[in-house]
A protein has these predicted regions:
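Short linker/helix segments within small regulatory modules
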Residues: 17-26, 86-93
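Charged, low-complexity helical/coil segments in non-catalytic cytosolic or luminal regions
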Residues: 69, 110-308
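Short functional micro-motifs and their immediate structural scaffolds
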Residues: 15-17, 35, 85, 103
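Juxtamembrane boundary at the C-terminal end of a transmembrane helix
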Residues: 349-359
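Residues immediately within or flanking Cys/His clusters that coordinate Zn2+
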Residues: 4-6, 24, 72-74, 92
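Short Cys/His-rich micro-motifs in 6-15 aa windows
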Residues: 31-38, 99-106
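Extended, hydrophilic extramembrane loops/domains of integral membrane proteins
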Residues: 300-326
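Short cysteine-rich clusters marking metal-coordination/redox-active sites
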Residues: 9-12, 27-30, 77-80, 95-98
Length: 359
């Protein structure tokens, strides 16, 4: 004998029962009522859901030509393990990541050759000016940091990025609520209505970036985005002249999870932005299927600025294409306390005036 199928309440997860009086499905736990037809449509949607398919093919890439590597040099940092490459006319004495001395290797040993490069658009002076502007208006910044601070080192570095592209078919399900409140003079009533909201659609993603270097903090690199890929060109070693290129030490395979997370979050945010009119909205589940997948390897331009204050190192990064600069700054604890006290006094004054005027 076939088993009896149970239907879950979309609001609380309890088992729905058929109410013969209402001729509806009703949850005995939260009181949610559903038309049988609506429940069948809801169940059909759930049955259509499939697991995520977000796999990728490996980048084939291209090998270096002998004449391309002849003029390249590789430097190794003995402290952080950073490995950079540049042309033979550009000398490196310090690591752009940690500032410690680097050792030159006479022979370049090639990895996968980059497919694309976005050339440096802004020069070193633009990076210095962006840094000075970054310090302005920071009321909690210690005065000594502003007065005594100077840039220890500034270097232009091409950061390796894996770029992912795909066509996405996705569907997401949300639980939403709407509340109505009224009174009859004696009691205040609240009616909460529960809804299941479905969204389904297709999106195209191109050149989703994931940095391929362990020396570059992920949040730092994501903070200086976006890069404009329309200005990317086919890679040529000539673009390395005067700059350094970090060599990737995170493979494409190891970058896939971050790429998938960024794609999935972007889809979720896009779908969620189409749902309006609910007091609460909670994502329940979703699935994403990727097709027409591709990946490539590119170098993006970044200015790295290193400075030292009170024996602590501070690193700032600037997008050398757009000029966006980010980096953490120290906080003056005394200024912070005074700032919080000031806010508290203002808040208390507003409350006092509110009750005083009402009285």
């Amino acid at each position: 004998m076939a088993g009896v199928k149970e239907y879950k309440c979309p609001s609380c997860g309890g088992v729905l029962e058929f109410d013969s009086t209402l001729q509806k499905m009703k949850c005995p736990y939260c009181g949610t009522e559903l038309e049988v037809e609506a429940l069948e449509a809801y169940d059909a949607h759930l049955n259509d859901e499939t697991p995520d398919d977000m796999t990728w093919d490996n980048v084939q890439g291209s090998d270096w030509e002998e004449e391309e590597t002849a003029g390249l040099r590789t430097y190794i940092c003995e402290s952080c393990g950073g490995e950079i490459m540049t042309d033979e006319s550009t000398a490196a004495s310090n690591c752009p990541f940690c500032g410690n001395p680097v050792v030159m290797m006479n022979q370049f040993s090639g990895q996968l050759k980059p497919d694309y490069v976005i050339p440096f658009k802004l020069d070193k002076e633009a990076a210095k000016e962006a840094y000075r502007k970054h310090l302005k208006g920071k009321i909690l910044l210690p005065k000594s940091f502003h007065d005594e601070n100077h840039i220890d080192e500034i270097k232009g570095v091409y950061v390796p990025f894996w770029l992912f592209g795909a066509h996405a078919d996705a569907s997401f399900r949300y639980n939403g609520t709407k509340k109505a409140v009224w009174d009859d003079g004696n009691y205040i009533y609240t009616r909460t209505s529960y809804y299941s909201i479905f969204r389904k659609g297709e999106l195209r993603f191109e050149h989703v970036p994931v940095d391929g270097s362990t020396k570059m903090a992920d949040d730092l690199m994501e903070s200086i985005e976006p890069f404009d890929f329309s200005e990317a060109v086919d890679f040529r070693t000539a673009y390395l002249s005067g700059y350094f290129a970090d060599r990737f030490d995170i493979s494409q395979d190891d970058s896939i999870n971050r790429a998938n997370a960024r794609i999935r979050q972007s889809i979720s945010d896009t779908f969620r932005g189409t749902v309006h009119g609910y007091q609460t909205l909670e994502e329940q589940d979703g699935n994403v299927r990727l097709t027409d997948r591709n990946a490539s390897y590119a170098l993006y331009p970044v200015w790295l600025l290193n400075t030292t204050w009170h024996d602590k190192n501070f690193t700032f990064a600037m997008n050398a294409q757009t000029g966006r600069l980010v980096g953490d700054l120290p906080t003056d604890n005394k200024k912070m306390i005074l700032f919080m006290v000031g806010l508290s006094l203002i808040f208390m004054a507003i409350i006092f005036l509110f009750f005083y005027l009402r009285a």
